[in-house]
């Protein structure tokens, strides 16, 4: 059960990104997204994602029986510039009473990332020199909403994960009919191939996404877990702020 619950957490922190040379911050409205996460018929978690022009926040936590077995809470905050690139990220998690917290600062002018662990023990900051531009996991997730998949059906992009520059592959497969709030919608079916590493924990390497074409947000996220099958994150509500 522990590993099943851990997998759903990463459905929210999916690392997919836009063409880094062409992307600009396309956020027109400030919104909050509410998701419920299921293992089969059982609801095991919830998530909230807040999207502002200068800051993104994702919160995820276990609920119900899953919370009693594996209590988990995580909050990821990323401050971004006018083009959507990360300037600073604060990542906090609490798992069965054990707290972890990290701060990451992106210095694009110097091709430098400052990485510091704050909890459970405060450690000395590290300077990591990598090629820019580069995204963290949350900012790349938000950026992915605005990709024109008819122009970019296959993309391989760099991400900052675990002190290194890694890559994610994203492939547009097909258009699908879907439903949200009792209305028929058009969705884009996308497959994402992720590094198994994450700033939070290990995750599934393949994730499927149904993206609402008109609202430009994920309607459904599905992570593949060998033997056990798939966990599903479902969009329940969009709130304009």
Give the predicted meaning of each segment.
Residues 101-145:
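Hydrophobic, well-structured mid-protein blocks that either form specific transmembrane helices
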Residues 1-6:
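Positively charged n-region of N-terminal signal peptides that target proteins for export
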Residues 26-109, 149-241:
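Acidic, serine/threonine-rich low-complexity disordered tracts
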Residues 8-21:
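Bacterial N-terminal signal peptides
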């Amino acid at each position: 059960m522990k590993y099943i619950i851990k997998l759903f957490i990463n459905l929210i922190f999916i690392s997919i990104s836009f063409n880094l040379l062409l992307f600009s911050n396309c956020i027109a409205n400030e919104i909050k997204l509410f998701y419920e996460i299921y293992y089969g018929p059982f609801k095991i978690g919830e998530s909230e994602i807040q999207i502002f022009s200068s800051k993104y926040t994702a919160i995820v936590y276990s609920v119900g029986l899953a919370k009693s077995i594996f209590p988990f809470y995580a909050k990821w905050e990323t401050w971004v510039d006018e083009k959507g690139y990360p300037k600073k990220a604060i990542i906090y998690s609490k798992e069965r009473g054990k707290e972890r917290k990290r701060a990451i600062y992106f210095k694009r002018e110097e091709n430098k990332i400052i990485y510091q662990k704050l909890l459970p023990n405060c450690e000395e900051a590290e300077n990591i020199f990598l090629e820019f531009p580069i995204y963290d996991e949350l900012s790349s997730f938000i950026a992915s909403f605005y990709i024109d998949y008819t122009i970019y059906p296959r993309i391989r992009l760099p991400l900052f994960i675990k002190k290194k520059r890694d890559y994610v592959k994203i492939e547009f497969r097909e258009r699908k009919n879907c439903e949200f709030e009792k209305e028929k919608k058009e969705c884009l079916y996308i497959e994402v191939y992720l590094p198994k590493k994450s700033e939070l924990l290990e995750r599934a390497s393949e994730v499927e996404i149904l993206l609402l074409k008109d609202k430009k947000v994920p309607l459904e996220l599905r992570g593949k877990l060998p033997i056990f099958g798939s966990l599903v994150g479902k969009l329940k509500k969009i709130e304009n702020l």
